[in-house]
């Protein structure tokens, strides 16, 4: 019963994929507090720490632990915390999952191992190992443009039968997929989109929410959009979605999280510091971001 309760609270609704703030090439814990408290203020359904948007691949293991520990302290059980545990090394991914459990997050997310191109059986065994490494609920993360490999529908079905694998975050472009998955998996397996621009279309096909990049700076508007959708106010949700579309576009004009890091900096949340091999936003991208922030009257 406890696992089902956690699933209901975490893998559903608006989950913000948080940026990780840096200053002088170190974690900026003061900025982290501003960022996290901004999410708590607008009652997002959960925050995702150390995912793709959080530059997880640039973090040392010690930084990863400090980031999670500090986030748990700041949140103080106000909202659930999901940690990112993706790695192309199964042993290291297990270590991330075990450390997440020890620190006290509420669940974790992981993608298939990137670069090494495992078979579907290899992907299954990777997640089976993560499942055995901890007691936390798990969300699968499908991001084929990043990882270079994806779950087949059959592998998702197999993995959904493991008792603590409870959701899928899908960053693909196949809008039929949630319908196909929904038809085969257990009833309480949730599917969410990771693409801001398709949230309404995705949820119309069986999704139950989204992990958002834009909600780093507009959690209040994203929350309102989902609330209208869940109340069957399709017109109201669509109006908000159309208003946000230029923001979604601006935030992906260059590789995520380059634009959202600059947007957060422009609004005073953190330094515009991003780790190599990523570089800060180009001048043209900065101008596009500034213009849409001004036109939408976004303030922190």
From Swiss-Prot:
SUPFAM superfamilies, per the entry: Aldolase
Residues that hold pyruvate according to the record: 53, 211
Localization per Swiss-Prot or TrEMBL: Cytoplasm
Alphabetical UniProt keywords: Amino-acid biosynthesis, Cytoplasm, Diaminopimelate biosynthesis, Lyase, Lysine biosynthesis, Schiff base
Top-rank EC class of the record's enzyme: lyase
Any one GO cellular component localisation term in the record: cytoplasm
Pathway note: Amino-acid biosynthesis; L-lysine biosynthesis via DAP pathway; (S)-tetrahydrodipicolinate from L-aspartate: step 3/4
GO biological process: diaminopimelate biosynthetic process; glyoxylate catabolic process; lysine biosynthetic process via diaminopimelate
InterPro entries (UniProt xref): Aldolase_TIM (IPR013785), DapA (IPR005263), DapA-like (IPR002220), Schiff_base-form_aldolases_AS (IPR020625), Schiff_base-form_aldolases_CS (IPR020624)
Site residues, Part of a proton relay during catalysis: 52, 115
A GO molecular-function annotation: 4-hydroxy-tetrahydrodipicolinate synthase activity
Region forming the signal peptide: none
Classification via PROSITE patterns: DHDPS_1 (PS00665), DHDPS_2 (PS00666)
Enzyme Commission number(s): 4.3.3.7
Catalytic reaction equation(s): L-aspartate 4-semialdehyde + pyruvate = (2S,4S)-4-hydroxy-2,3,4,5-tetrahydrodipicolinate + H2O + H(+)
Summary of subunit composition and partner proteins: Homotetramer; dimer of dimers.
Membership in a protein family: Belongs to the DapA family.
Function statement: Catalyzes the condensation of (S)-aspartate-beta-semialdehyde [(S)-ASA] and pyruvate to 4-hydroxy-tetrahydrodipicolinate (HTPA).
Listed name of the protein: 4-hydroxy-tetrahydrodipicolinate synthase
Source organism: Rickettsia massiliae (strain Mtu5)
Source taxonomy: Bacteria, Pseudomonadati, Pseudomonadota, Alphaproteobacteria, Rickettsiales
């Amino acid at each position: 019963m406890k696992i089902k309760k956690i699933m209901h609270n975490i893998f559903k609704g608006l989950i913000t994929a948080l940026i990780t703030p840096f200053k002088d090439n170190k974690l900026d814990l003061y900025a982290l507090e501003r960022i996290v408290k901004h999410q708590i203020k607008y009652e997002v359904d959960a925050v995702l720490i150390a995912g793709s948007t959080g530059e997880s691949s640039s973090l040392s293991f010690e930084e990863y632990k400090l980031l999670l520990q500090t986030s748990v302290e700041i949140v103080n059980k106000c909202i659930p915390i999901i940690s990112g545990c993706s790695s192309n090394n199964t042993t290291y991914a297990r270590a991330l999952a075990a450390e997440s459990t020890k620190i006290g997050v509420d669940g974790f997310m992981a993608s298939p191992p990137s670069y090494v191109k495992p078979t579907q059986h290899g992907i299954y065994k990777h997640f089976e190992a993560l499942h055995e490494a901890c007691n936390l609920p798990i969300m699968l993360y499908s991001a084929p443009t990043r990882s270079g490999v994806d779950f087949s529908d059959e592998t998702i079905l197999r993995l959904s039968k493991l008792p603590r694998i409870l959701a899928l975050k899908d960053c693909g472009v196949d809008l039929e997929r949630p319908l196909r998955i929904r038809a085969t998996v257990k009833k309480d397996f949730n599917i969410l989109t990771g693409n801001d621009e398709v949230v309404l279309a995705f949820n119309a096909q069986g999704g139950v929410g989204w992990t958002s990049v834009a909600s780093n700076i507009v959690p209040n508007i994203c929350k309102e959009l989902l609330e209208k959708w869940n109340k069957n106010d399709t017109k109201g949700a669509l109006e908000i979605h159309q208003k946000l579309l230029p923001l979604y576009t601006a935030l992906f004009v260059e590789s995520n999280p380059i634009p959202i890091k600059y947007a957060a900096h422009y609004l005073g949340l953190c330094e515009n510091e991003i780790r190599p091999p990523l570089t800060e936003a180009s001048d043209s991208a900065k101008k596009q971001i500034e213009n849409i922030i001004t036109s939408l009257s976004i303030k922190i």
